[in-house]
Amino acid sequence: MLDLYVIKEGKRLRCGYTTGSCAAAAAKAAAIMLETGKVLQFVEIDTPANIPLKLEVHNPSIDPEKASCAIVKDAGDDPDNTDGIEIYAEVRKRQDGQVHIHGGTGIGRIVRKGLFGTVGQAAINPVPLQMIEKEIRAVSDKGYDVTIYAPQGEVIAKKTFNANIGIEGGISIIGTKGIVYPMSEEALIKTIYMEMDMVEQKHGLSNIILVPGNYGEKISDTLGLSEARVKISNYIGDSLLYAYNKGFQSMTLIGHIGKFSKLSIGVFNTHSKVCDGRMEAFIYYLALMGAPRQLIEEVNGAVTAEEGLHICIDAGYGEVIKKMEQGAEQKIRKYIKDENYPVKVIIYSMERGVHMG
């Protein structure tokens, strides 16, 4: 277990190490075992973050032709779907003095242009490739074939963003620092940007559809808006600016009333820890519509956005949704500093769907 911590929002969170570090450590351990014929319990590697790691070696195997072992991924306190996965390396000798690195079972393959490698190549990022070769060279200057594999990879990959960014069949071996820093919003946002890059390559720069999550995807499917679509989670502002500056000619945003009520009053990170303005949004637009004070007070007492919406509709003010959609469009244009930009916002309810006005 890595004894390294960061403080985030007043909490002490433990760091972990990347799949790239796991692959490099497994490769080094396997190379040592192949050369010495001795089983290792631990292996030490350097990381690009200049933080050394001493990692436990699992399932070691040695025979005259090859050696293999696994390192178990530890994501620390980061909510990482690959936490606990076993990353294996099998090392065989070559006669030409070169190190060739391959992806085996459970390692994804690149299926779209525009990523860090070529189509058909194993999804092992450049920094992990460098780490693997460096650690192999710390053992010997001989030639080796190194195969990285993850028996659980194909199953775990279904819980990741890989399919959306053009990687299929398994996980990616990633990490630019070798260390996992907990709760990395930067990594999530970069993934969203990569998805937008893939949309551009596949569909061009006409219209892009942005949805916060899975339900937004389902609603967009029912509206016939299933292509050129990216899930953006709560990072609406970052996503808008990236899409606009990338040159998309128009945008369509589809989201639940709970998130997009906030957007309608200019909240561009809709996570509950950042801001809650749901009832405030209802009250603002109801006031502009001239709604009676009694209705406004009733909505102010609602606990959820769905409840607030029901109150409005029952009182004959269902058009508040249309006002919120229009308001959100205006806020977006102001945010990206383009008052004439074509943007469409569609708000849905879990019970009532869309077009509630």
UniProtKB/Swiss-Prot annotation:
Superkingdom field: Bacteria
Keywords: Cobalamin biosynthesis, Methyltransferase, S-adenosyl-L-methionine, Transferase
Signal peptide: none
Keyword Membrane on entry: no
EC primary class: transferase
GO terms for MF: cobalt-precorrin-5B C1-methyltransferase activity
Pathways involved: Cofactor biosynthesis; adenosylcobalamin biosynthesis; cob(II)yrinate a,c-diamide from sirohydrochlorin (anaerobic route): step 6/10
Record-level GO BP terms: anaerobic cobalamin biosynthetic process; methylation
Matches recorded under SUPFAM superfamilies: CbiD-like
UniProt EC number: 2.1.1.195
Catalyzed reactions per annotation: Co-precorrin-5B + S-adenosyl-L-methionine = Co-precorrin-6A + S-adenosyl-L-homocysteine
Family listed: Belongs to the CbiD family.
Protein name, entry field: Cobalt-precorrin-5B C(1)-methyltransferase
Lineage: Bacteria, Bacillati, Bacillota, Clostridia, Peptostreptococcales
Protein encoded by which gene: cbiD
